[in-house]
């Protein structure tokens, strides 16, 4: 059973896979339009829900709670829980405010990064997760992209983290991953989202 302390640790990190055998660092110029269209669609996707599991590893500690994430524009609601609903944790946020509730414990801060810094003493790019989970590098930030032979983005490096996308599925014409690995060698840090089931707006499809 996942303890409440472990789930609190996992939830803090949240407020922060092998690649295809045939890959290239960048597609030819005349094929860039495929990724350009996909990235534009992902940027416009600001309302979505997902369910799955997330394995959180940091400094040799590891936990795997279930996750339900509702995202509406820049506001989000993330629920984490373990076996038999143990350690039920709720994270809610919007620009300028974020809170975490677990039982009778309540924490709040101006940003998810600030909350992690207050509670754990770590600086992590948590605000990037809303982009990375969709398979989208944070716009206007340097990133090294890796594509497969279908010109699908399968991995990228950004802000000293490596993000690997796998089990790509079609959701009403939009490609989204069912697994996302986010890793950094420092502190042996890893977030592994698996079994993701996405629900998109009515003009998109729900896929599993």
Locate predicted features.
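Post-signal-peptide N-terminal segment of Sec-exported extracytoplasmic proteins
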Residues: 41-77
């Amino acid at each position: 059973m996942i303890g409440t302390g472990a789930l609190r640790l996992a939830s803090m990190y949240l407020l922060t896979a092998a690649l295809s055998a045939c890959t290239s660092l960048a597609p030819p110029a005349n094929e860039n339009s495929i990724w350009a269209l996909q990235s534009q669609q992902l940027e416009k996707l600001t309302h979505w829900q997902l369910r799955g599991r997330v394995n959180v590893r940091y400094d040799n500690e590891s936990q795997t709670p279930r996750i339900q994430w509702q995202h509406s524009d820049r506001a989000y609601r993330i629920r984490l829980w373990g076996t038999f609903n143990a350690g039920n944790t709720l994270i809610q946020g919007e620009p300028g405010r974020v809170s975490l509730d677990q039982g009778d414990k309540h924490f709040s801060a101006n940003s998810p990064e600030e909350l992690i810094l207050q509670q754990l003493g770590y600086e992590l790019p948590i605000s990037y997760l809303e982009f990375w989970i969709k398979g989208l590098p944070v716009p206007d930030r340097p990133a090294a992209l890796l594509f497969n032979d279908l010109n699908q983005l399968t991995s990228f490096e950004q802000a000293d983290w490596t993000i690997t996308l796998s089990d790509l599925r079609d959701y009403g014409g939009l490609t989204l991953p069912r697994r996302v690995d986010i890793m950094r060698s420092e502190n042996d840090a890893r977030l592994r989202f698996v079994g993701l089931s996405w629900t998109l707006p009515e003009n998109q499809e729900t896929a599993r």
